[in-house]
UniProtKB/Swiss-Prot annotation:
PANTHER family: ECF RNA POLYMERASE SIGMA FACTOR SIGK, RNA POLYMERASE ECF-TYPE SIGMA FACTO. Residues 140-187 are annotated as: Sigma-70 factor domain-4. The gene is sigK. The sigma-70 factor domain-2 mediates sequence-specific interaction with the -10 element in promoter DNA, and plays an important role in melting the double-stranded DNA and the formation of the transcription bubble. The sigma-70 factor domain-2 mediates interaction with the RNA polymerase subunits RpoB and RpoC. The sigma-70 factor domain-4 contains a helix-turn-helix (H-T-H) motif that mediates interaction with the -35 element in promoter DNA. The domain also mediates interaction with the RNA polymerase subunit RpoA. Interactions between sigma-70 factor domain-4 and anti-sigma factors prevents interaction of sigma factors with the RNA polymerase catalytic core. This is ECF RNA polymerase sigma factor SigK. Interacts transiently with the RNA polymerase catalytic core formed by RpoA, RpoB, RpoC and RpoZ (2 alpha, 1 beta, 1 beta' and 1 omega subunit) to form the RNA polymerase holoenzyme that can initiate transcription. Interacts (via sigma-70 factor domain 4) with anti-sigma-K factor RskA. Keywords: DNA-binding, Sigma factor, Transcription, Transcription regulation. CDD domains: Sigma70_r4 (cd06171). The keyword Hydrolase does not apply. Sigma factors are initiation factors that promote the attachment of RNA polymerase to specific initiation sites and are then released. Extracytoplasmic function (ECF) sigma factors are held in an inactive form by an anti-sigma factor until released by regulated intramembrane proteolysis. It comes from the Bacteria. The lineage of its organism: Bacteria, Bacillati, Actinomycetota, Actinomycetes, Mycobacteriales. Residues 161-180 bind DNA. A motif (Polymerase core binding) lies at residues 59-62. GO terms for biological process: DNA-templated transcription initiation.
Length: 193
């Protein structure tokens, strides 16, 4: 029975991918095209297995080859084969893309949940508002004429206490007293005391 052994990379043995990567590091466009043609199916396949989306896989593969163009000089033939280096770049970039998409999705979920207004029942709100108005009008009827008149001028017409006292030709202290008594009467009538 024979034991399976790992393939051994012999030091300083160069392949044509090694040569192409060195040429890409020197900004050789033709070498980059040749490297791309020879490796794209494996790189794209690795990315697609991680991302499972053809569109994202194409974008990510493009990013990987841009990174290869920019950093081909960092490839060390003693550390492994050119294909292993490319597939490591591909895997890392694909995993980064997955993490980025998940983070974006979580941000959108948090933002969406925080910015969605709860549904409003306009009919129910209108009915409640009409009922509250009716109750206030009924309670206003329980006040004295002087209290009701002072409250109407202040709260419905927007006059200040001084303006109410001038309009009614009454002392400011008297108007304040009528207002306090009227508000107390409204609170009692509305059950807010």
């Amino acid at each position: 029975m024979t034991a399976l052994t790992q393939p051994v990379r012999l030091p300083f043995v160069t392949t044509d991918l090694d040569v192409l990567l060195r040429q890409v590091a020197e900004r050789d466009v033709d070498a980059f095209a040749a490297l791309y043609d020879r490796t794209r199916s494996r790189v794209y396949g690795m990315v697609t297995r991680v991302l499972r989306d053809p569109g994202y896989s194409e974008e990510t593969t493009q990013d990987i080859y841009l990174q290869v163009w920019r950093s081909a000089g960092s490839y060390d033939p003693k550390a492994g084969s050119p294909m292993a280096w490319l597939l490591t770049l591909a895997h890392r970039r694909a995993v980064d893309r997955v993490r980025s998409e998940e983070a974006a999705s979580q941000r959108e979920s948090r933002y969406g949940a925080a910015s969605v207004d709860p549904p409003v029942d306009h009919v129910a709100d209108s009915v409640i508002l009409l009922d509250e108005r009716r109750r206030v009008v009924d309670c206003m009827g329980s006040l004295s004429d002087l209290q009701r008149e002072a409250i109407q001028l202040a709260y419905y017409e927007g006059l200040t206490y001084v303006q109410v006292s001038e309009r009614l030709s009454a002392n400011l202290a008297t108007i304040k007293s009528r207002m306090r008594g009227g508000i107390r009467g409204l609170k009692n009538c509305l059950g807010m005391s």
